[in-house]
Amino acid sequence: MVEMNFKVDAFEGPLDLLLHLIGQLEVDIYDIPMAEITDQYMEFVHTMQEMELDVASEYLVMAATLLAIKSKMLLPKQELEIDYDTLEEEEDPRDALVEKLMEYKRFKEAAKELKEKEAERSFYFSKPPMDLAEYDDGTKVAELDVSLNDMLSAFNKMLRRKKLNKPLHTRITTQEISIDERMDSVLGKLHQQVNHRLRFDELFEEQTKEQLVVTFLALLELMKRKLVEVEQAESFADLYVQGKGEELS
């Protein structure tokens, strides 16, 4: 018999103790030698009682279970006339115990893995979120009545139309213009209208391709600043730019 050498409080329950005993004997968990395991388990329980320690009821229940399994396996098998047509494999008395042990072992291994991950995580330190209130100027991004895809589609359609109408011979002149200047230009055109409203393509008349791009970017910036909004009555209808704000008063 393997020498008993473990602390009484080293186990989390009877299944934990059984796994320890099986490990000491170095036997297959699916082929537990019940006589030897039961004897060692009972020795553990007796040791606890001799030390006047409270023996948890779960240990006593397991002791009774082990003794019952041991008794079943020691009973002589009756020699019966065998009908091989209806022969079924006799159930092993240890099956239920083995199933519980395997389930407990899986949980124990999972708990060990989680503990290792917790130890790894302890080496990382999270930085609390910064207060960015001082960087908030209160400006909110304008909610578009039309999507950016709608605007890009209208812009590309306008570029194709201008390309078709472009004369065969043109004189190219370089004229740099900033987005801020074009924003003022767009607001100026809207201000000239009674209702401060223009059709989208009316903002892009008589311009080079480069100027068209600058105008489009200026329009996006004006929308961001909530100085204008782009509207569309229904899907695939013309886009309209509506001025708003004190700049148009």
UniProtKB/Swiss-Prot annotation:
Protein's GO biological process: cell division; chromosome segregation; DNA replication
Keywords: Cell cycle, Cell division, Chromosome partition, Cytoplasm
Localisation: Cytoplasm
Location, primary (coarse class): cytoplasm
InterPro entries: ScpA, ScpA-like_C
Keyword Cell division: yes
Domain of life of the source: Bacteria
Pfam family, one: SMC_ScpA
Assigned GO CC terms: cytoplasm
Subunit structure: Component of a cohesin-like complex composed of ScpA, ScpB and the Smc homodimer, in which ScpA and ScpB bind to the head domain of Smc. The presence of the three proteins is required for the association of the complex with DNA.
UniProt record similarity statement: Belongs to the ScpA family.
Physiological role: Participates in chromosomal partition during cell division. May act via the formation of a condensin-like complex containing Smc and ScpB that pull DNA away from mid-cell into both cell halves.
Protein name from the UniProt record: Segregation and condensation protein A
Organism: Listeria monocytogenes serotype 4a (strain HCC23)
Taxonomic lineage from the root: Bacteria, Bacillati, Bacillota, Bacilli, Bacillales
